């Protein structure tokens, strides 16, 4: 994948893998990078570090993802690479968890990928190029004791 002069969006960019992706894209010559996170202060810090743009988004909400795509498309003139990276873990174990716990992790770790695809792929298909990168985990391939909700969502992300 050629990075130089590409317009990039990364969700979950306030810390961890998302922040490091932004830094890596910048170091490989990306033209424009938008750091997206529910933690806007963290996204702004990342954006400052890479001379990029930052936006707030709760990726569990389709409307937030749609707005990010619309705003960055308008600002950058399109999106070449969309990294759907935001994710959560650390929820209660199977017997301790509630339906709301499962719904929350599903919306963030799976639905966010689906919403991103729905709203960013049309412009990429129209241009005949672009990359949608969905972050998952080895937990989606291996059983993890005490992490069933996380593992299930990561397996779904691998399959999507």
State the predicted function of each range.
Residues 3-32:
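Canonical Rossmann dinucleotide-binding motif of NAD(H)/NADP(H)-dependent dehydrogenases/reductases
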Residues 30-43:
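Conserved glycine-rich Rossmann-like NAD(P)H-binding loop of the short-chain dehydrogenase/reductase
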Residues 40-41, 57-67, 99:
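The beta1-alpha1 cofactor-binding region of Rossmann-like NAD(H)/NADP(H)-dependent oxidoreductases
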Residues 93-106:
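Substrate-binding pocket helix/loop in short-chain dehydrogenase/reductase
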Residues 95, 142-148:
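Active-site loop immediately N-terminal to the catalytic Tyr-X3-Lys motif
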Residues 117, 153:
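Active-site helix of classical SDR
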Residues 137:
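Residue(s) in the substrate-gating loop at a strand-loop-helix junction
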């Amino acid at each position: 994948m050629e990075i130089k002069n590409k317009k990039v969006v990364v969700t979950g960019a306030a810390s961890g893998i998302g922040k490091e992706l932004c830094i890596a894209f910048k170091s490989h010559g990306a033209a424009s990078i938008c750091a997206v996170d529910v933690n806007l202060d963290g996204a702004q810090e990342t954006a400052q570090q890479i001379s990029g743009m930052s936006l707030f988004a709760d990726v569990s909400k389709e409307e937030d993802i749609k707005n990010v795509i619309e705003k960055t498309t308008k600002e950058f003139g399109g999106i070449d690479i969309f990294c759907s990276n935001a994710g959560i873990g650390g929820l209660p174990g199977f017997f301790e968890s509630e339906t709301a716990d499962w719904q929350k992790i599903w919306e963030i770790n799976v639905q966010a990928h689906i919403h991103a695809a729905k709203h960013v792929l049309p412009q990429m298909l129209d241009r005949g190029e672009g990359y949608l990168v969905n972050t998952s985990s080895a937990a989606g391939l291996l059983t993890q004791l005490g992490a069933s909700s996380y593992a299930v969502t990561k397996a779904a992300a691998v399959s999507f």
